[in-house]
Amino acid sequence: MSEARRDSTSSLQRKKPPWLKLDIPSAVPPTAEEPSFLQPLRRQAFLRSVSMPAETAHISSPHHELRRSVLQRQTSITQTIRRGTADWFGVSKDSDSTQKWQRKSIRHCSQRYGKLKPQVLRELDLPSQDNVSLTSTETPPPLYVGPCQLGMQKIIDPLARGRAFRVADDTAEGLSAPHTPVTPGAASLCSFSSSRSGFHRLPRRRKRESVAKMSFRAAAALMKGRSVRDGTLRRAQRRSFTPASFLEEDTTDFPDELDTSFFAREGILHEELSTYPDEVFESPSEAALKDWEKAPEQADLTGGALDRSELERSHLMLPLERGWRKQKEGAAAPQPKVRLRQEVVSTAGPRRGQRIAVPVRKLFAREKRPYGLGMVGRLTNRTYRKRIDSFVKRQIEDMDDHRPFFTYWLTFVHSLVTILAVCIYGIAPVGFSQHETVDSVLRNRGVYENVKYVQQENFWIGPSSEALIHLGAKFSPCMRQDPQVHSFIRSAREREKHSACCVRNDRSGCVQTSEEECSSTLAVWVKWPIHPSAPELAGHKRQFGSVCHQDPRVCDEPSSEDPHEWPEDITKWPICTKNSAGNHTNHPHMDCVITGRPCCIGTKGRCEITSREYCDFMRGYFHEEATLCSQVHCMDDVCGLLPFLNPEVPDQFYRLWLSLFLHAGILHCLVSICFQMTVLRDLEKLAGWHRIAIIYLLSGVTGNLASAIFLPYRAEVGPAGSQFGILACLFVELFQSWQILARPWRAFFKLLAVVLFLFTFGLLPWIDNFAHISGFISGLFLSFAFLPYISFGKFDLYRKRCQIIIFQVVFLGLLAGLVVLFYFYPVRCEWCEFLTCIPFTDKFCEKYELDAQLH
């Protein structure tokens, strides 16, 4: 039997042509440490074709090789919390998310802060941000493979032209790539590892018909009097073969099932290879092989594209002996033929789900943001430095972009709130000075007077300052009991305590005034206890009063009965909702027609007893139910929103973050949207919505708190502090990527120029520089604490942990100090206004109707 086999083998060897030589690698027995299906990975030369781009071969373990994992003890809650916290802050030792973050940071740095160092670019091998050029649709150039690498040489497929158009859907990016010629009946390891191999090239399932097409076909069948089912059955009967897509599950899945008949016998191999043109597969002569062995070592040009001149000289893309073209006479002699060692690829079709998944990946494909080279980096022409550590390179490659959900949500809220504010409260006069309105209005004395209303113009095209305060602007008197405002209200109540009802002699009306404002000739000032109508309290006449249209003797609700008698001080009297007597009480202050009631005017809690016409002209809040200013709380009317828990003590501290969602006008909102859709969106794609939201909100709150301390009587709106906190993130990102940037100082000064320009822009009205400064400082602290960054070693990792703790403590100390200054130790700063608004004219910064000096 063995002799017969030897005879057949020798006969096959005699039939083998002299130019054919095959080097079949011998099988290596599997070791005890590694599974057998991983052994082919040791020799990467047999995992791919030379005509294909190099890819990392990855073969999944077959199902029958999987073993049940050993039972392990479940991690404790403390360890889970500790690991999750380390992953969130980016200081975990073995966290995949940390590596992804670091690789993403490098990509962002390359876009935002300029070029990287050349070594960084070489080791990172970042993908190009440009679109696919037209050259990618042409035939890819042949690759050069050194002669000493397992005998693999140049392999040129003259039929490879136009492959980019045929296989562009194999990758998510749609990039073209050369493909190995398909040999039926065999499969290779590369066909399982490469997403660009011919493993995914079976005929696909027929696309399902759309609803519109099926509806149209059903309507046509009904018009013809046929059944839709009959047509479907007739079409199904035409098929006499099984669709190829139904056999996808029967294709080769694992290396154990590879068809090795291709490598079995030399005779069969020669018969199969003889069917291919000689122009494609060529082998060198023995003399040429000996010359190559004696030749000196060549430079490592593996994977490089051949020059056009070399291609023309060697005629690699043209048939050498026969074909559709002939070699030109006088041309250089072709290179000697070399032995071929090429991988054979299976013809298995695409896996299930690729038809839809690939177009979807193309649709949602986005450019990744290199760390430190985002949008601002592209504007400032930043680059990476030439050299970078391989550990840093891996961190950059692992980074993935986040979706900017917070930016989109914030932009939607800003736009919606601005539109509603403008529609409800209208637009104030546009400009940089003050707008004055003069009109003749009926006052509380019963005569018409010329009055003037002064309003600060708003160049942002938006509501007035009073409307913004009512909406939730940053305004200290609404957030705490301001000493000056409280003193102003107390002095007004003290004057009202000694007032009385002034009844005109012609019975035209009465109004609550002081003795100086009541004419002794034309009116009578009904003052208790001098006037005989004074009531008694505890056996003696009351010392303060009277009050127009209010008397404890005739009020039923609330009644003045022992032990709930009304106090001596009229400023503590309640509002009478029901009187027992009619219009005739024989008391002059009760039988007259009242012409003035309390009206809250301005934003400082000022109250006047005046007519409704005058109150409406001054844009005030008229109280028809009250008779004294002490019975109303003007600060509650001015501030709006939720009422105070104690009417005497404002407590709307939530204005610190509520004002971040308000804008002074349409232009102000557009500026914020532009900032958010460029800088904020770019950073959120790098760091994620949770980190950016924390930095954005806390920076804005800190900036508004500092502004409320130094500019307490100015209404400020907008996310000024938050925006400067986000700009601080750019500085932190620049500092963290300082070691990998080619020109870090240049990027630093460019970024500093942008911040100084925005700070100068804050000297205009309605823009708060105190919020800018405080938001920037707090943003620096928060960015150092919450933004993970690229680590350059174990020491740098430990330094990051200390940095997180230190900057969190510093930020909490800053926030606590500002809270103490705001609520317990108010600061009075006279020159602080010049830091946020320079008075170029006498009315350029005229207090916005919010005077720092209350009078």
From Swiss-Prot:
Cytoplasmic topology ranges: 1-411, 677-691, 736-746, 794-803
Residues of this chain annotated as glycosylated in UniProt: 583
Keywords: Endoplasmic reticulum, Glycoprotein, Golgi apparatus, Growth factor binding, Membrane, Phosphoprotein, Protein transport, Transmembrane, Transmembrane helix, Transport
Domain of life: Eukaryota
Residues bearing PTM Phosphothreonine: 180, 183
GO biological process terms, semicolon-separated: cell migration; cell population proliferation; negative regulation of protein secretion; protein transport; regulation of epidermal growth factor receptor signaling pathway; regulation of proteasomal protein catabolic process
Region span, Disordered: 1-36
Keyword Electron transport: no
Quaternary structure annotation from Swiss-Prot or TrEMBL: Homodimer, or homooligomer. Interacts with TGFA and HBEGF. Interacts with EGF; may retain EGF in the endoplasmic reticulum and regulates its degradation through the endoplasmic reticulum-associated degradation (ERAD). Interacts (via cytoplasmic N-terminus) with FRMD8/iTAP; this interaction leads to mutual protein stabilization. Interacts with ADAM17/TACE.
Family stated for the protein in its record: Belongs to the peptidase S54 family.
Name the record gives this protein: Inactive rhomboid protein 1
